């Protein structure tokens, strides 16, 4: 068998944007996540809008003209 074939698997801390930290096993030194089980709407029972960097606004802006263009095309 070859030696040093697999990466080192160690205990590391995963930190959430809400401030929660979890100890997990990984090959990385540090893990940062945007949402975890303490702040995710499915687990908390509260509905919350999660908009990362204005994705909803960009989507609405990108596709805003399609309804008008489709209506004009039908006429």
Curated annotation (Swiss-Prot):
It holds the Pfam family Ribosomal_L31. Its cofactor is Zn(2+). One of its GO terms (molecular function) is rRNA binding. PROSITE patterns: RIBOSOMAL_L31 (PS01143). SUPFAM superfamilies: L28p-like (SSF143800). Zn(2+) binds at residues 16, 18, 36, 39. Keywords: Metal-binding, Ribonucleoprotein, Ribosomal protein, RNA-binding, rRNA-binding, Zinc. GO terms for cellular component: ribonucleoprotein complex; ribosome. Binds 1 zinc ion per subunit. GO terms for biological process: translation. It comes from the Bacteria. PANTHER family: 50S RIBOSOMAL PROTEIN L31, CHLOROPLASTIC, LARGE RIBOSOMAL SUBUNIT PROTEIN BL31C. Binds the 23S rRNA. Part of the 50S ribosomal subunit. Belongs to the bacterial ribosomal protein bL31 family. Type A subfamily. This is Large ribosomal subunit protein bL31. It comes from Desulforapulum autotrophicum (strain ATCC 43914 / DSM 3382 / VKM B-1955 / HRM2).
């Amino acid at each position: 068998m070859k030696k040093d074939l697999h990466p080192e698997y160690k205990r590391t801390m995963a930190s959430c944007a809400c401030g929660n930290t979890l100890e997990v096993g990984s090959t990385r030194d540090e893990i940062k996540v945007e949402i975890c089980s303490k702040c995710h709407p499915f687990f908390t029972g509260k509905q919350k809008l999660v908009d990362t960097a204005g994705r909803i606004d960009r989507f609405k802006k990108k596709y805003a003209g399609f309804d008008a263009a489709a209506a004009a095309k039908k006429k």
